[in-house]
Amino acid sequence: MKEQKWIHEGLITESLTNGMFWVRLDNKDLIIGYVSGNIRHSFIRILPGDKVKIEVSRYNSTRGRIIYRLRNKYYKD
């Protein structure tokens, strides 16, 4: 059986190396997020200030996988 995961929305606060970011969740928690394979494969650029959906494991709530970048009115895509 697959493990259950929580999905949160958050704001990218700082970019780290190798596709990792500090993400401030809507409940004010600060966690490390890494880019999922589909986002990496599609060359979707994630910058500080972007709103994202992040998938967090129930067992380790300090890290999460960024699964979606929410639309921003300033982007042209």
UniProtKB/Swiss-Prot annotation:
Belongs to the IF-1 family. PANTHER family: TRANSLATION INITIATION FACTOR IF-1, CHLOROPLASTIC. InterPro entries: NA-bd_OB-fold (IPR012340), RNA-binding_domain_S1_IF1 (IPR006196), TIF_IF1 (IPR004368). One of its GO terms (molecular function) is translation initiation factor activity. Gene3D superfamilies: Nucleic acid-binding proteins. It comes from Epifagus virginiana (Beechdrops). It is found in: Plastid. The keyword rRNA-binding applies. Pfam families: eIF-1a. This is Translation initiation factor IF-1, plastid. One of the essential components for the initiation of protein synthesis. Stabilizes the binding of IF-2 and IF-3 on the 30S subunit to which N-formylmethionyl-tRNA(fMet) subsequently binds. Helps modulate mRNA selection, yielding the 30S pre-initiation complex (PIC). Upon addition of the 50S ribosomal subunit IF-1, IF-2 and IF-3 are released leaving the mature 70S translation initiation complex. Keywords: Initiation factor, Plastid, Protein biosynthesis, RNA-binding, rRNA-binding. GO terms for cellular component: cytosol; plastid. Residues 1-71 form the S1-like domain. SUPFAM superfamilies: Nucleic acid-binding proteins. Component of the 30S ribosomal translation pre-initiation complex which assembles on the 30S ribosome in the order IF-2 and IF-3, IF-1 and N-formylmethionyl-tRNA(fMet); mRNA recruitment can occur at any time during PIC assembly. The gene is infA.
